[in-house]
């Protein structure tokens, strides 16, 4: 019976939809079945703008979202991502560090700061964030795979 329960648990874990690296606005800080929790419209707008490649607009929405949201790690991760895509690397580092200070195990922030470290030729720091993801992603995750692939490409280009 214990083996059956274990198999059911494993099955359920694989069926569970883990958050995407950017932090899906529909699952970030509100329960979809709980209408009493406010939806952060600014964060949802920012997420849409990031997906559309409108990073300057996304940053404006993210600044609004940061004023009222309790899920600041996701917001700062998107801020870092948006700044990185605009080649504002110092600002990107600043926001990724803020996200990781709030949530050191944030998958998206660890992946993206690792990629940013590769962009600034700091392989050692990128590998440190890969180790964090290895610990966080017990059954593997896209963030780990993406950073691992980026590190391999970086090493092959040397």
What residue spans do the PLM features occupy?
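Alpha-helical segment of the N-proximal tetratricopeptide repeat
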Residues: 37-68, 72
